[in-house]
From Swiss-Prot:
Protein name: UDP-N-acetylglucosamine 1-carboxyvinyltransferase
Cross-referenced NCBIfam families: murA (TIGR01072), PRK09369.1 (NF006873)
Protein's organism: Fervidobacterium nodosum (strain ATCC 35602 / DSM 5306 / Rt17-B1)
GO MF annotations, alphabetized: UDP-N-acetylglucosamine 1-carboxyvinyltransferase activity
UniProt pathway annotation: Cell wall biogenesis; peptidoglycan biosynthesis
Binding residues annotated for phosphoenolpyruvate, in chain numbering: K21, N22
Length: 423
């Protein structure tokens, strides 16, 4: 596994945000629902995106990816309904092709998915939802098979937790099933709205995305379309926190500020200076910032994918803070690494208690998942001396041109390959 070497740097300047990874993946999966050409713009060049494209190709789809322009074109028939383990093991979002393939051609099978190791992330919500909309689910030697059955005229799927992946999976699958599907306690993330917009451009009838109740009125057939992916709010939040944690100032461009209201609320409480524009934000670190208490919750709450990064920022705050993780309750592998850098933190159940320190100190730390790795890079940039972050391949799953973007902001950063990133 490769490593990233960083030294103390004040981040400043401008950075442009890419299309959202967490939109690109379900949108690519939804393109399975038609044989006509679907064109996506602002597609980020990421290893996870490449994996999803490989999955589409293994089904028989024709996929063209212009990496320089960020354009993907998908068309053609599905000829293979089994997804290979080598692809599925890399990424959890791969599971979201099961329903669309089975809905279109009658059945599909896939091994259990992989992805970041950040605690329990069961697929039960997906499977129970698929059953509610008429699918027969069976298990055989570690593989899940979905077979299209008879759907009721009106199906209600209640999600015990507003799972983003399950909401997207059921929305897309139900789009070409007969009758009405109602998803209760649906996830409300902006990426859900983006998926609804794509599906409706393809001829679907989906309503309510962005609320806790989504209604899908099935249609017989979908068609091709063109669609531009929304900006990546998590990438934006990562660079914003990086600028502030290193006592810098900068402008983060190509964002939708309304998608980050929970972050603005937290940062303004700490004393950060935030100036929001129509599609950009200017941020400036105060000389001293203050601790605060954060509850990590499903959208519109504070996002779990920014929890590791905000811990770095709060570790250098004046005063104490608490961060309670209510989405992935064991997502704290990065805490031990931050403590090794001098942070004063302890975990009690699903809460991190933080007492701010004046400085962090560079050392060798290990990236454990995508967002934790990004957080450790930020910690290294804010720390005294040199920091080496090992096992960093995770970061290339979710941050396009991450080394170049940090460098443009003034970071002293270098990637040492130990196995080339899969992009």
């Amino acid at each position: 596994m490769g490593s990233i070497i960083v030294e103390r740097s004040k981040l400043s300047g401008e950075v442009e945000i890419s299309g959202a990874k967490n939109s690109a993946l379900p949108l690519l999966a939804a393109a399975l629902l038609t044989e006509e050409e679907v064109t996506l713009y602002k597609v980020p060049v990421l290893s996870d995106v490449e994996t999803m494209i490989d999955i589409l190709r293994t089904t028989g789809k024709d996929v063209f990816f212009d990496k320089h322009k960020g354009i993907v074109k998908i068309s053609g028939k599905i000829s293979i309904t089994h997804i290979q383990y080598e692809l599925v093991r890399k990424m959890r979002a791969s599971f979201n092709v099961l329903g669309p393939i089975a809905a279109l051609v009658g059945e599909a099978s896939t091994p259990l998915p992989g992805g970041c190791a950040i605690g329990a992330r069961p697929v039960d919500f997906h499977l129970e939802g698929l059953k509610k909309i008429g699918f027969e689910i069976s298990f055989d030697h570690g593989e899940i098979r979905a077979k299209r059955g008879k759907k009721e005229e009106e199906s209600v799927v209640y999600l015990p937790f507003p799972s983003v992946g399950a909401t997207e999976h059921i929305m897309s699958t139900a789009a070409i099933l007969p009758g009405k599907t109602i998803i209760e306690n649906a996830a409300m993330e902006p990426e859900i709205i983006d998926l609804q917009n794509l599906l409706n451009k393809m001829g679907a009838k989906v309503y309510g995305a962005g609320t806790s109740k989504i209604i899908v009125e099935g249609v017989e057939k979908l068609h091709g379309c063109e669609h531009t992916i929304i900006p990546d709010r998590i990438e934006a939040g990562t660079y914003i926190i990086g600028i502030l944690a290193t006592k810098g100032e900068g402008i983060v461009k190509n964002i939708i500020p309304e998608h980050l209201e929970a972050l603005w609320f937290v940062l303004e409480k700490t004393g950060a200076i935030i100036k929001k524009g129509e599609n950009e934000v200017e941020v400036k670190s105060p000389d001293k910032w203050y601790g605060c208490d954060i509850n990590v919750l499903p959208y519109p709450g504070f996002p779990t994918d920014l929890q590791p990064q905000i811990l770095v920022y709060l570790s250098l705050a004046d005063g104490s803070s608490t961060v309670t993780e209510n989405v992935f309750k064991t997502r704290f592998a990065h805490v031990a690494e931050l403590v090794r850098m001098g942070a004063n933190m302890k975990i009690i159940e699903n809460t991190v208690f933080i007492n701010g320190v004046e400085k962090l100190y560079g050392t060798t730390v290990m990236g454990t998942d995508l967002r934790a790795t990004a957080a450790l890079v930020i910690a290294g940039l804010a720390a005294e001396d040199r920091t080496e972050v090992t096992s960093v391949e995770h970061i290339f799953r979710g941050y396009e041109n991450v080394i170049e973007k940090f460098s443009k902001l003034g970071a002293s950063i270098k990637y040492i390959p130990g196995g080339v990133p899969e992009i």
